[in-house]
Amino acid sequence: MPKRETKKIKPSQEVIKEGPFLVAIHLKGIYMSNYTNSPCAACKFLRRKCTSDCVFAPYFPPEEPTKFANVHRIFGASNVSKILHEVAPHQREDAVNSLAYEAEARLKDPVYGCVGAISVLQRQVLRLQRELEETNADLMRYAGCLGGETTSAYGGRRG
């Protein structure tokens, strides 16, 4: 447990330093110093104060600045804010993840975006289906070459 440092500022106020946090205890309640609370990636990017009711904070943590930068670059902060307000709270995380995926895909492929990735995957599925059909046909031909012969449980042929 980190060492706790306490010092009195005024008779009505006491400051406690515990780990990275600085807590001021007033007679009216407890207030945390804002310098230790990092703003969310969106507020940091937009250079504004991150409030407790920030719509971006739960979905754009300070550790992921490129996630918001990409989303902002493609969709714009105002549009993302509107989307988050229109979406039900339990669906917002999925909406943000979808926006982040689409933004990253659009930055990689400005013309097709995620549709280009979907197209590549569809072609890959078709190629693998054809390969599977060809392999099954080869297997049937091989089984047909054996004719009436069957194999025993021990791998030997019985005629």
Swiss-Prot record:
Ranges that cross the membrane = none
Q: List each copy of the LOB domain by range.
A: 38-139
In terms of Pfam families, this protein maps to: LOB
Which PROSITE patterns did the record assign? Answer: LOB (PS50891)
List the expressing tissues. Answer: Expressed in young shoots, roots, stems, leaves and flowers.
* Matches recorded under InterPro entries: LOB
Q: Which family does it belong to?
A: Belongs to the LOB domain-containing protein family.
This chain belongs to the protein called LOB domain-containing protein 25
Specify the species: Arabidopsis thaliana
What gene does the UniProt entry assign to this protein? LBD25
